[in-house]
UniProtKB/Swiss-Prot annotation:
PANTHER family: TYROSINE PHOSPHATSE N18, PUTATIVE-RELATED, TYROSINE-PROTEIN PHOSPHATASE NON-RECEPTOR TYPE 22. This is Tyrosine-protein phosphatase non-receptor type 22. GO terms for molecular function: kinase binding; non-membrane spanning protein tyrosine phosphatase activity; protein tyrosine phosphatase activity; SH3 domain binding. The gene is Ptpn22. Induction: By lipopolysaccharides (LPS). The modification Phosphoserine is found at residues 35, 452, 634, 680, 687. It is an enzyme of class 3 (hydrolase). The active site is at residue 227. Disruption phenotype: Knockout reduces the conversion of phosphoanandamide (p-AEA) to AEA in the brain.
C-alpha cells in the first residue's frame, strides 16, 4: 500500500472513532492501567530520581523520570553540581534522543536547566505553559524579556535579542553566553494552553510545530519541550510532531496507531498525554494532519499527471528552412528573446488548427498509416495537443518535458483539456520514453515540423449553381451508366501517390516541395473523419459514429464484402469512373484539411478507438453533387497510376506498387455514407475475404411492383439479352434470405428516382419507353405521391375488388 491508501484507511478509522467517544475513554483507560502497572511492578525503575538528594529537584512526587531514559548532566560548573535533572529522552523517528521532555525549572534547578541546554547544544525550546497558572507558580523564568538586562544563572548569561509575537505564542531569540562562547537559542512560548485542558483550536498548535521545524528541520540535536510537569502538554507536542515527521517523509506505516504511539512514549516518561481530553486532542491534530497531507498528495499527484501528460520526448530541435534551433533551460527564467521565439512558434501552432479545430495527436490503427517520403529525415519532436485557450502556454524544454509556463505579463491559466495522456498511458504518472525506431504500442509518433504549418485548410469550394434536383439527376445518370455494365470491379488501392492525393483535393499545395522517393521517410498517419449526412440522419455530425465508411453487408462467415476494402483517404469518397482509365478521386466531402506537401509532418502512428474526431462543419446539398464531363463514357476501371503512399504492413499491402483487385463489389443503402476500414486490415495476419457473386444493375435498388412490371416490358424489347438474365437473377436475389437489403431513412428521398431509373428504357431505343402511371419527378414530395400505394402483398387477392 502506498501512503495515499494508508492515509485514507487511517482517516476512515479515526473518523469512526471520533463519532464514538466511548472508544477514546476505553483506550485512555488502558493507557492509565498500563502506567499503573509499570509503577506497581517497577518495570521501569526510577531509582535515581528517588534518591534523597534528588527528591527536592522534582516538582511533583509522582512524575519521576525512568532510569533508562534519564538525561544525565556531565557539564559541571561547581562542586555542588550533580548529574540529575528531571528530564527524559523521547525517541523520535530517526533517533532515540529526538526530544527532551522536562519539567518547568524550579528556582533550585535553573542552573541545571541551562547546563542541560548547553551540554546537549539545544537550539529550540518549546514552553507549553505560563509562568503562573491558577495563582500557582508553574515555571521559573529562565529567559530574559526584550530590553531587560541580561540574566545571570551561574556562569551563564542570558539575554533576549528579539521577540516575535504570534496569535497564541511568542518566538524569542535568546543569546546565551558561557566561557566566552555565545550561542543563539529560540524559545517558542505557547501562552493559551490551560493546564489539564486543551486549547480551543488545534491550528495554533500545528502552526507552532510548523514554525518549530522551520528553525530545526532534523533531529541532529534534541528539541527541548516542557510544560509544568513535563508530561501532559509536553506529550501532546511530542506525539503530534512525531506524526508530522512521518508524514513529511512519507513513511507512515500500515499499522500506525495513536494509541500505540502514546503507549510507547509512556514507556520513556510517565504520564505523557496526561488526560483523556489531551488524548482526544492528539487524535484531532493527527486527523487534521492527515487531511492536509492528503490534499498535498492529491496536488502533487495531479501535478505529476499534468507533467507526464505534457512530457514531450525530443531527440533534437533542429528546425529546417529558416528557423533556428531552440535551447531552453529547464529551471531558469527565459529571457525576452527566447520568450519571443516561443510566442512566435506558439502563434504558428495555434494558426494551424483554425479558430475551432485543434491539432490532436493520438494513436491510430496500423491499417490507417500512410508513409510519405521526404527529401531529408531531420530530427523530430512531438507536438503537444493544442486546444483553444491554452495552446499558447506550452513551453518545450530540452529534457523532453513541457512545463506550463505563462508568458511574461499574462496571468496564469488552467489547462482545460490535457487528457490525451490518459488516453495514451492510462493512469500512469510518468510518460514512457518514446523511441522513434521501435515505438511502444500506444506511444505517440514523432512530428516533424518545418517552416510552414503542419496542416492547411483547403480553399473554399466553389459554389455550385446546380439545384438539388439537378444534383440528384446527375447522380442518377452516373449510377445508371455504371450499372449498365455487366459487373463492377473495384480494385483495392494499396498505394496512393501523394501527388494524386493532392490532385484529388482542390487547392492542393505544390508537389515539388516533397520529393517522392527520398531515403528519409516522413510518416503521416491519416484517419477518416467524415460527418454523417445532416439531412438524412438524426445523429449529430460530431458524434462518435462520424467516421466515413460504407455499411456493406457481411457474408455469413463474417467476412466483409470486397466493396469495404476501399482505401482510407482523408475525408474523400471515390467514384471509380475515369474516361482515361485512371483512378480519379472525386471528393464528396472535404471538411478536413488535405496534406500540405510543403510541410513535413509526422502525426501519431496509432489512434485509440474511444477518441472522438474534432467537430466538422455541416454539409450542404451541393456537396452531394458530383460534376463530370457530359457525354463521356464510364468504362470499367482496369488499371491505375503508379502510387507512392503505402498503407501499414498487412497481407494485402506488402509495400509494393502492385494493386490487389476483387471481382465484384456490393453496395447496400445505409443510413450514412461511411468508409469503414476492412476487417482484413484489422487482422494483419488474416487472408482477404473471398469475392461475392456477381451483382447486377437492378440488384442495387429496392424493387416494387411497378418497377418489376416495367422492367418486364422493357427487357422483352431490349437488345441486351444478358440484362434480362440479370433482371431474373436480381429478383431471385431479392427473395434470397441471406441477401436481403435493409431500408434506410436517408434513402427514402430516392424512391421516385429509383422508379424512374427502373422504368427508363434502354439508350438504344428511346422511343419504346414504358412509363408507369405513378411515375413522376422525384422532386415532387407531395403527400399523395409518397403514400399513393397501400402497403400489402405484391399480388392482392381477388376478394379485395381493386
Amino acid at each position: 500500500m502506498d501512503q495515499r491508501e494508508i492515509l485514507q484507511q487511517l482517516l476512515k478509522e479515526a473518523q469512526k472513532k471520533k463519532l464514538n467517544s466511548e472508544e477514546f475513554a476505553s483506550e485512555f483507560l488502558k493507557l492509565k492501567r498500563q502506567s499503573t502497572k509499570y509503577k506497581a511492578d517497577k518495570i521501569y525503575p526510577t531509582t535515581v530520581a528517588q534518591r534523597p538528594k534528588n527528591i527536592k529537584k522534582n516538582r511533583y512526587k509522582d512524575i519521576l523520570p525512568y532510569d533508562h531514559s534519564l538525561v544525565e548532566l556531565s557539564l559541571l560548573t561547581s562542586d555542588e553540581d550533580s548529574s540529575y535533572i528531571n528530564a527524559s529522552f523521547i525517541k523520535g523517528v530517526y533517533g532515540p534522543k529526538a526530544y527532551i521532555a522536562t519539567q518547568g525549572p524550579l528556582s533550585t534547578t535553573l542552573l541545571d536547566f541551562w547546563r542541560m541546554i548547553w551540554e546537549y547544544r539545544i537550539l529550540v525550546i518549546v514552553m507549553a505553559c505560563m509562568e503562573f497558572e491558577m495563582g500557582k507558580k508553574k515555571c521559573e523564568r529562565y529567559w530574559a524579556e526584550p530590553g531587560e538586562t541580561q540574566l545571570q544563572f551561574g556562569p551563564f548569561s542570558i539575554s533576549c535579542e528579539a521577540e516575535k509575537k504570534k496569535s497564541d505564542y511568542k518566538i524569542r531569540t535568546l543569546k546565551a553566553k558561557f566561557n566566552n562562547e555565545t550561542r543563539i537559542i529560540y524559545q517558542f512560548h505557547y501562552k493559551n494552553w490551560p493546564d489539564h485542558d486543551v486549547p480551543s483550536s488545534i491550528d495554533p498548535i500545528l502552526q507552532l510545530i510548523w514554525d518549530m521545524r522551520c528553525y530545526q528541520e532534523d533531529d541532529c540535536v534534541p528539541i527541548c519541550i516542557h510544560c509544568s510537569a513535563g508530561c501532559g502538554r509536553t506529550g501532546v507536542i511530542c506525539a503530534v510532531d512525531y506524526t508530522w515527521m512521518l508524514l513529511k517523509d512519507g513513511i507512515i506505516p500500515k499499522n500506525f496507531s495513536v494509541f500505540n504511539l502514546i503507549q510507547e512514549m509512556r514507556t520513556q516518561r510517565p504520564s505523557l498525554v496526561q488526560t483523556q481530553e489531551q488524548y482526544e486532542l492528539v487524535y484531532s491534530a493527527v486527523l487534521e494532519l492527515f487531511k492536509r497531507h492528503m490534499d498535498v498528495i492529491s496536488d502533487n499527484h495531479l501535478g505529476r499527471e499534468i507533467q507526464a501528460q505534457c512530457s514531450i520526448p525530443e531527440q533534437s530541435l533542429t528546425v529546417e528552412a529558416d528557423s533556428c534551433p531552440l535551447d531552453l533551460p529547464k529551471n531558469a527564467m527565459r529571457d525576452v528573446k527566447t520568450t519571443n521565439q516561443h510566442s512566435k512558434q506558439g502563434a504558428e501552432a495555434e494558426s494551424t488548427g483554425g479558430s475551432s479545430l485543434g491539432l490532436r495527436t493520438s494513436t491510430m490503427n496500423a491499417e490507417e498509416e500512410l508513409v510519405l517520403h521526404s527529401a531529408k529525415s531531420s530530427p523530430s519532436f512531438n507536438c503537444l495537443e493544442l486546444n483553444c485557450g491554452c495552446n499558447n502556454k506550452a513551453v518545450i524544454t530540452r529534457n523532453g518535458q513541457a512545463r506550463a509556463s505563462p508568458v511574461v505579463g499574462e496571468p496564469l491559466q488552467k489547462y482545460q483539456s490535457l487528457d490525451f495522456g490518459s488516453m495514451l498511458f492510462g493512469s500512469c504518472p510518468s510518460a514512457l520514453p518514446i523511441n522513434t525506431a521501435d515505438r511502444y504500442h500506444n506511444s505517440k509518433g514523432p512530428v516533424k515540423r518545418t517552416k510552414s504549418t503542419p496542416f492547411e485548410l483547403i480553399q473554399q469550394r466553389k459554389t455550385n449553381d446546380l439545384a438539388v434536383g439537378d444534383g440528384f439527376s446527375c447522380l442518377e445518370s452516373q449510377l445508371h451508366e455504371h450499372y449498365s455494365l455487366r459487373e463492377l470491379q473495384v480494385q483495392r488501392v494499396a498505394h496512393v501517390s501523394s501527388e494524386e492525393l493532392n490532385y484529388s483535393l482542390p487547392g492542393a499545395c505544390d508537389a515539388s516541395c516533397v520529393p517522392r522517393h527520398s531515403p528519409g521517410a516522413l510518416r503521416v498517419h491519416l484517419y477518416t473523419s467524415l460527418a454523417e449526412d445532416p439531412y438524412f440522419s438524426s445523429s449529430p455530425p460530431n458524434s462518435a459514429d462520424s467516421k466515413m465508411s460504407f455499411d456493406l453487408p457481411e457474408k455469413q462467415d463474417g467476412a466483409t464484402s470486397p466493396g469495404a476494402l476501399l482505401p482510407a483517404s482523408s475525408t474523400t469518397s471515390f467514384f471509380y469512373s475515369n474516361p482515361h482509365d485512371s483512378l480519379v478521386m472525386n471528393t464528396l466531402t472535404s471538411f478536413s484539411p488535405p496534406l500540405n506537401q510543403e510541410t513535413a509532418v509526422e502525426a501519431p502512428s496509432r489512434r485509440t478507438d474511444d477518441e472522438i474526431p474534432p467537430p466538422l462543419p455541416e454539409r450542404t446539398p451541393e456537396s452531394f453533387i458530383v460534376v463530370e464531363e457530359a457525354g463521356e463514357p464510364s468504362p470499367r476501371v482496369t488499371e491505375s497510376l503508379p502510387l507512392v503512399v503505402t498503407f501499414g504492413a498487412s497481407p494485402e499491402c506488402s509495400g509494393t506498387s502492385e494493386m490487389k483487385s476483387h471481382d465484384s463489389v456490393g453496395f447496400t443503402p445505409s443510413k450514412n455514407v461511411k468508409l469503414r476500414s476492412p476487417k482484413s486490415d484489422r487482422h494483419q495476419d488474416g487472408s482477404p475475404p473471398p469475392p461475392l457473386p456477381e451483382r447486377t444493375l437492378e440488384s442495387f435498388f429496392l424493387a416494387d411492383e411497378d418497377c418489376i412490371q416495367a422492367q418486364a416490358v422493357q427487357t422483352s424489347s431490349t437488345s441486351y439479352p444478358e440484362t434480362t438474365e440479370n433482371s431474373t437473377s436480381s429478383k431471385q436475389t431479392l427473395r434470397t434470405p441471406g441477401k436481403s437489403f435493409t431500408r434506410s431513412k436517408s434513402l427514402k428521398i430516392f424512391r421516385n428516382m429509383k422508379k424512374s431509373v427502373c422504368n427508363s428504357s434502354s439508350p438504344s431505343k428511346p422511343t419504346e419507353r414504358v412509363q408507369p402511371k405513378n411515375s413522376s419527378s422525384f422532386l415532387n414530395f407531395g403527400f399523395g405521391n409518397r403514400f399513393s400505394k397501400p402497403k400489402g402483398p405484391r399480388n392482392p387477392p381477388s376478394a379485395w375488388n381493386m
